[in-house]
Amino acid sequence: MIELSLIDFYLCFLAFLLFLVLIMLIIFWFSLELQDHNETCHA
């Protein structure tokens, strides 16, 4: 039971980290897209 709960906690933690990284990448890509659009519009 203890090993299973530790494995479940580890998997949940990994999933949470992957989710955070995915959100960071999306925000980073979105900010880059906004910068590109602003540059093209002003130019």
Curated annotation (Swiss-Prot):
It is a single-pass membrane protein. The keyword Transmembrane helix applies. Changing residue 11 to F: In strain: Omicron/BA.4. The lineage of its organism: Viruses, Riboviria, Orthornavirae, Pisuviricota, Pisoniviricetes. This is ORF7b protein. GO terms for molecular function: identical protein binding. The chain crosses the membrane at residues 9-29. GO terms for cellular component: host cell endosome membrane; host cell Golgi membrane; membrane. Its main location: host cell.
